[in-house]
Amino acid sequence: LVAQYSDTHNMCEYDPVLEQYVAYCRNWFFSRRGIGRAVSDNFRRFPLSEEALWPDPTMDPDELWYANGKTKMPGTNDYHVMFPKRWSIRHDKFDIHLFTSPDNLIWHRVPGGPVCEVGDPGDWDGGVVAPGIGLVELPGGRMGVPLVGSKVPHKYPRKAPLGAIGWAWWPKGRLVAL
């Protein structure tokens, strides 16, 4: 257990290379939301998280990292990827980016901008897109992460049903191309 406020999805996994449990959760860095990381030998006891991702100098003052979407490349134990959701508070808009890590500790943003953005107004994903957890192989030579979409923005009054589920997908082996 850890006594920490985290109002978004959290994930915890056993890292066989580190031989420790690693959890990713909401964190606050200088009063701005970010992604926290906590590590423990004991699944029942975690320290407070430390900053893993926080708003960097390339981001606008109203932008922050909202949810982590941490996973691994399918079939690997040591190829870590994260699909964090960036929130522009001013525009009440989310988009999803791609980060990679060679060690489940140090994270780098893959250049090229968002890997997933909201759809057109009125579409099932026209207001919000949010990553799920788990990059998996899909039929038809694809791989993808679960995605939740909503027709209305995050701070817009809404009632059930709140959204729909879909996939953000790429051709297998083509998540990043050089």
Regions found by a protein language model. Name each.
Residues 1-178:
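Carbohydrate-active catalytic/glycan-binding domains of CAZyme proteins
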